[in-house]
Design a protein with these regions (language model features):
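Acidic, glycine-rich catalytic/binding loops that coordinate metals and/or anionic ligands
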Residues: 2-6, 35-49, 71, 118-125, ...
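Short, acidic/hydrophobic/Gly-rich beta-strand patch recurrent on exposed beta strands
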Residues: 68-70, 97-103, 148
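Short glycine/threonine/proline-enriched tight-turn/helix- or strand-capping micro-motif at secondary-structure
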Residues: 49-80
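Zn2+-dependent peptidoglycan hydrolase active-site motif and core
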Residues: 81-116
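Bacterial N-terminal signal peptides
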Residues: 15-27
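Flexible, gly/ser-rich surface segments that form the specificity/activation loops bordering the active-site cleft
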Residues: 87-91, 96, 127-145, 153
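C-terminal region of N-terminal signal peptides and the immediate post-cleavage residues
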Residues: 24-37
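Short, well-structured beta-strand-loop connectors
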Residues: 77-87, 117-134
């Protein structure tokens, strides 16, 4: 009898813990200090919805999605995700783009963004770098920011596309089964 009661309380405690964890995850609550820590942050505020995720191509010339699409609104201010130097502010294939070089061979790109900064400008995380405009095709939202990142490494200046969400150092919550 006593063993059955103990088992019931153990199961009830686990269920309650999972329910609380799920409620926290679904609320999207992130402590302010966690949201603002680390060298990189979100390029849009408030924290945007990720409409399309990173899909690394097998080779740089093959199909894939070399960044993430973040839901925004036309005219919204776009922020530098981290400290760096603006290396490009202009048009690529008719789309306005801003690119920033960061320490360690990292470059982030923001598109379609009308620049408020000039090439050579030093920026810090959170600096307004431009204004989001409509026109990013392939995004399910009416207006999206395409945020990309790539790293140059090695003696041959090899370029590797990386998931910009990985720069945020947010640890995703993963629920594990109670029983193996």
């Amino acid at each position: 009898m006593r063993q059955a009661a103990l088992r019931t309380w153990t199961i009830l405690g686990r269920v309650l813990g999972v329910v609380c964890l799920v409620a926290i995850v679904l609320s999207g609550a992130v402590p302010a200090e966690a949201a603002e820590s680390g060298p990189f942050g979100w390029p849009l505020r408030p924290r945007p919805t990720v409409e399309r995720r990173f899909d690394k191509p097998e080779r740089n010339w093959l199909p894939g999605h070399r960044g993430v699409d973040l839901a925004g609104s036309a005219g919204q201010t776009v922020l530098a995700a981290g400290d760096g130097i603006v290396v490009f502010a202009g048009e690529v294939a008719g789309k306005p783009v801003v690119s920033i070089d960061h320490p360690g061979g990292l470059r982030t790109t923001y598109e379609p963004v009308t620049a408020k900064v000039a090439v050579g400008s030093r920026v810090v995380r959170g600096t307004a770098i431009g204004t989001l405009v409509a026109g990013h095709e392939g995004c399910p939202a009416a207006v999206c920011l395409h945020w990309g990142a790539r790293r140059e490494s090695g003696a041959h200046n090899r370029r590797e596309y990386v998931d910009p969400l990985g720069l945020l150092h947010e640890v995703p919550v993963r629920l594990k089964p109670l029983e193996p």
